[in-house]
UniProtKB/Swiss-Prot annotation:
Database matches in PANTHER family: LARGE RIBOSOMAL SUBUNIT PROTEIN UL13M, RIBOSOMAL PROTEIN L13
Family: Belongs to the universal ribosomal protein uL13 family.
Pfam families per record: Ribosomal_L13
GO MF annotation list: mRNA binding; structural constituent of ribosome
Gene3D superfamilies reported in the protein's UniProt record: Ribosomal protein L13
InterPro entries: Ribosomal_uL13 (IPR005822), Ribosomal_uL13_bac-type (IPR005823), Ribosomal_uL13_CS (IPR023563), Ribosomal_uL13_sf (IPR036899)
Organism: Orientia tsutsugamushi (strain Boryong) (Rickettsia tsutsugamushi)
High-level lineage: Bacteria, Pseudomonadati, Pseudomonadota, Alphaproteobacteria, Rickettsiales
Alphabetized UniProt keyword annotations: Ribonucleoprotein, Ribosomal protein
Entry function: This protein is one of the early assembly proteins of the 50S ribosomal subunit, although it is not seen to bind rRNA by itself. It is important during the early stages of 50S assembly.
Lineage top rank: taxon: Bacteria
HAMAP family (UniProt xref): Ribosomal_uL13
Gene Ontology CC entries for this record: cytosolic large ribosomal subunit
Quaternary state and interactors: Part of the 50S ribosomal subunit.
Protein name: Large ribosomal subunit protein uL13
């Protein structure tokens, strides 16, 4: 038996819709990274972009476990301007409260993909939106029930 290697004509991409309301960020990002790479398919080929397209809605309602959204002891995100002393620090809580809460999901997924040309191509198949609406209705995305797969995937408001 020979090892299967997918050809570009054999790759079929589907559109998957995930509602991020009350979902745990790390678990969501890990699953989305697997779907974007195509590792959930039996026809996975490491050097081809055989993953699906993923649409995530309600990005502002994603949850962080533990004390990660705390300003003093939480999760920090760093960026550098390139100038001496130009390091900028922000917290996960500030990103979620900002005008662009979808960036926290994008950062989490991007850091779980390979950092090469193929990883950048696979990351371009991710679409994250704040709110319920998205412009991809023509692609007829299939709703993926990520919350129902495991009870740890969801974090309710009243659980601390």
């Amino acid at each position: 038996m020979k090892t299967y290697s997918a050809k570009p004509a054999e790759i079929s991409k589907k559109w998957i819709l995930i509602d991020a309301t009350n979902l745990v960020l790390g678990r969501l990002a890990a699953k989305v990274a697997v779907v974007l790479r195509g590792k959930d398919k039996p026809t996975y080929t490491p050097h081809m972009d055989c993953g699906n397209n993923v649409i995530i809605i309600n990005a502002e309602h994603v949850k962080l476990t533990g004390d990660k959204s705390n300003a003093k002891s939480g999760k920090f995100y760093y960026r550098h301007s390139g100038f001496p002393g130009g390091i900028k620090v922000t917290t996960a809580g500030k990103i979620l409260q900002s005008n662009y809460p979808e960036r926290i999901i994008q950062l989490a997924v991007k850091r779980m993909l390979p950092s090469n040309k193929l990883g950048r191509k696979q990351f371009s198949n991710l679409y994250v939106y704040k709110g319920q609406t998205h412009p991809h209705a023509a692609q007829t995305p299939v709703l993926y029930d990520f919350a129902g797969k495991n009870s740890k995937n969801i974090r309710n408001q009243n659980i601390v």
